[in-house]
Amino acid sequence: MSLYTTIHLHNVAAGRAEDYARWFDGAHQQDLARLRGFRSADRYEVTPQQIMPDIPQPWRFLSVYEFDYAAPEIDLPALAPLLAQARDAGLIDDSDESERIHSYAMYSDWVASPNHRADQPFSGVSIILANFVAGREAEYHHWYDTVHGPEVTRVPGKVAMKRGRLSPLQVEPRRYCPGSDLVFCAQQTDDLLFTVKDFSARARGVSPSGVAFQPRSSAGSFARTVHYFARASGTRFWPGGIAYDGDLSVYPADFARPAG
């Protein structure tokens, strides 16, 4: 079996947001359940809080489709007609040709940290459309697996990570993807600003926790974009608080207060 994740980055036609949500949680989920290897489908909405606030966020919504395929070359294309239903019904705003559907062969399933509360859903996710430096792929993966993945998922509110490679198997519309790899992180927090600020603080070595990230590997390319989203589908939502297997009392009360 092969784990695949397909991400659908999209915007919704004006006045059709409720129609799209109703379709996604209703008929679309029923159709997906009939596909071989289907595991889950969730939808998320872009958040005001971003770790790279100056980069464009071209998409308001992200849908994530998880599969465990026996024969990806046969089963992955079956997703295309289901995604086309939204386009055919006029639910997608692709007037600027920003819609993107990218499928990835995952290196592993979720790798969770001690922060993770397995009995609760994710509050949101972040994706990195990532690249490694040419000739240094093995070093890049080793750094992520042994250093960066574990340190990232121990940030308060961050709970799990998995990564994958852009698959040669894609569904329409097949459009440019700026990264060869997907870095997919899960959050469980009701204070994303806190999580984002402490991520940045740990990267700079100034976190009130005293925890500092290891130096960034030069095998990781700076040609990447990061996008944060909050859960926008289903019936179960994160109940509140910040998932953290540590002491939040070391953080000042105003740590996550917006500047100004």
Task: Give the location of each predicted region.
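Macromolecular interaction modules
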Residues: 1-260
